Amino acid sequence: MLAFSLLVLGLLAEVAPASCQQGLGNLQPWMQGLIAVAVFLVLVAIVFAVNHFWCQEEPEPGSTVMIIGNKADGVLVGMDGRYSSMASGFRSSEHKNAYENVLEEEGRVRSTPM
């Protein structure tokens, strides 16, 4: 085995180095830039796709809406027959499905000029 290895090494040392083929020529600078931008955009698209599928959060079971029986309204899981006390302060006395627009105090409202 050692003799075969030395024979191959000797033959490779005696052979003249191969001449590489010359390319068709350098690309124009605008073409190099166009290719670079296209490759960059493809890489960014791949990163966004991986991020979208990898970092997807599962919906919390408490915030999912399910319909039970013939009920027309969606009911939060575990909230059947209960209501939010926060919404009772906004209810209108004119209609059961209407809400009042509560005016905020002037100091608490932040407005910016356009």
UniProtKB/Swiss-Prot annotation:
Subcellular localization(s) per the UniProt record: Apical cell membrane
Cytoplasmic compartment spans: 52-114
InterPro entries given in the database record: PDZK1IP1/SMIM24
Give ranges for the Extracellular compartment.
Answer: 1-28
Residue positions where Phosphoserine is found in the record = 85
- Asked if the record carries the keyword Cell membrane, the reply is yes
Hydrolase among keywords: no
Which UniProt keyword terms apply here?
Cell membrane, Membrane, Phosphoprotein, Transmembrane, Transmembrane helix
State a GO cellular component annotated for this protein. Answer: apical plasma membrane
Q: How does it sit in the membrane?
A: Single-pass membrane protein
* Assembly information from the UniProt record: Forms a heterodimer (via N-terminal transmembrane helix) with SLC5A2/SGLT2 (via TM13); this interaction enhances SLC5A2 transporter activity. Interacts with PDZK1.
Q: Which family does it belong to?
A: Belongs to the PDZK1-interacting protein 1/SMIM24 family.
Main role? Auxiliary protein of electrogenic Na(+)-coupled sugar symporter SLC5A2/SGLT2 and SLC5A1/SGLT1. Essential for the transporter activity of SLC5A2/SGLT2 but not SLC5A1/SGLT1.
List the protein's name: PDZK1-interacting protein 1
Give the classification, highest ranks: Eukaryota, Metazoa, Chordata, Craniata, Vertebrata
